[in-house]
Amino acid sequence: MTLNLRVMTPNRTVWNSEVQEMILSTNSGQIGVLPNHAPLLTALDIGITKIRLNGQWSTMALMGGFAMVDNNQVTILVNEAEEAAGIDPQEAKETFRIAQTNLARAEGKKQVIEANLAFKRAKARLEAIDATLSYASN
C-alpha cells in the first residue's frame, strides 16, 4: 500500500508520485506518515522532509507551509521546496556560513528575525544534503 504525495509551491509542482512513507517537520516536531494514516492538517516548519520510495529514501528541504493527509493522499503546500539532489553542496555551505555571520551581526528586532529566517533556510538545505549522503553510505 502507498501514499499519493504532491508537493506544491506557488510556482510549480515539485513532487507528484506514490511513496511508501514520509517524515514531515512540523512546528511541533517530526511526524511519520504511513498508508492509512488518520486525517491530519498541520503547519510545516522550515526543515526537511524524508520520503521513502521503492525502498530508497529521498530528502527535500521545505521552507514552511502546510500538509494535509487524508485517505492516503498527502498534499503539501509550501513557499519553496528543493530536492536534496538538486542542491549544490558548496553553494549551500557558503550560504549557511553567510547566514551564520549575518545572524551573529544582526541588530534590532527586524534584522534578527530576517537573519534567523535566512539561517533556518540555509540550515534546512544543508540538512537535506547531509541526510541524503547518510542514506547513500548505508
Curated annotation (Swiss-Prot):
Compartment(s) of residence: Plastid, Chloroplast thylakoid membrane
Quaternary organization: F-type ATPases have 2 components, CF(1) - the catalytic core - and CF(0) - the membrane proton channel. CF(1) has five subunits: alpha(3), beta(3), gamma(1), delta(1), epsilon(1). CF(0) has three main subunits: a, b and c.
NCBIfam families hit by this protein: ATP_synt_epsi
Lineage, opening ranks: Eukaryota, Viridiplantae, Streptophyta, Embryophyta, Tracheophyta
Recorded family membership: Belongs to the ATPase epsilon chain family.
Keyword Cell division in record: no
Described purpose of this protein according to its UniProt entry: Produces ATP from ADP in the presence of a proton gradient across the membrane.
This protein's name: ATP synthase epsilon chain, chloroplastic
An annotated Gene Ontology molecular function: proton-transporting ATP synthase activity, rotational mechanism
Listed Gene3D superfamilies: 6.10.140.480, F0F1 ATP synthase delta/epsilon subunit, N-terminal
InterPro entries in UniProt: ATP_synth_F1_dsu/esu, ATP_synth_F1_dsu/esu_N, ATP_synth_F1_esu_C, ATPsynth_dsu/esu_N
Membrane topology field: Peripheral membrane protein
Keywords from the named record: ATP synthesis, CF(1), Chloroplast, Hydrogen ion transport, Ion transport, Membrane, Plastid, Thylakoid, Transport
Source organism: Huperzia lucidula (Shining clubmoss)
Domain of life: Eukaryota
Gene Ontology CC annotations of this record: chloroplast thylakoid membrane; proton-transporting ATP synthase complex
Short name of one Pfam family: ATP-synt_DE_N
